A protein has these predicted regions:
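PLD/PLD-like phosphodiesterase catalytic module centered on the HKD motif
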Residues: 1-30, 34-158
């Protein structure tokens, strides 16, 4: 673990670090999780933080294996996608990548929160540390390129 890394092992600490990464983001947010549940995208607090980020001109990319959790439990996030469709994109990974079981969020290629396995809350956050972001960033780009668009918010879809 990097000396600047902040370890966590509870949902509360993970969510706090995720919100800190969103708050630190100026230009880009890149999120990967098997179902998006760890990011608490349906909560008022996360919705407000993401809206503030997008209002500042940021862009959001979310990659996941299955969109069902977000479709069923995150109407605020679906409204955010509708309201900021020009700045947000979500993609679903292909079946050959479904074994990937970690989770991470990256802001501006400077800040990262990552869980080592999606079944556990254990992970770490690093801020103002481009070296800590290198591997997750390359992994995200590879996942993104292999994935297809999902979560298309439409008037009939909401």
């Amino acid at each position: 673990m990097d000396a600047r890394a902040i370890p966590f092992d509870t949902r509360r600490d993970c969510e706090a670090q995720f919100l800190a990464v969103v708050a630190a983001a100026q230009h880009s947010l890149r999120l990967f999780d098997p179902d998006g549940a760890v990011f608490a995208l349906g909560t008022i607090q996360v919705n407000a933080a993401l809206r503030a980020f997008l209002q500042r001109g940021g862009t959001l990319r979310l990659a996941l294996h299955e969109p069902g959790h977000i479709e069923r439990h995150c109407p605020r996030f679906l409204r955010l996608l509708r309201d900021y469709g020009h700045a947000c994109e979500c993609r679903q990974s292909p079946k050959n990548l479904r074994q990937l079981s970690d989770s991470f969020s990256i802001a501006d290629e400077q800040h990262v929160v990552r869980r080592f396995h999606s079944d556990h809350m254990r992970g770490e956050a690093s801020f103002d540390d481009p070296r800590a972001v290198e591997v997750p960033h390359h992994r995200f780009e590879a996942i993104w390129e292999a994935s297809r668009p999902t979560l298309h918010p439409t008037t009939t879809g909401l």
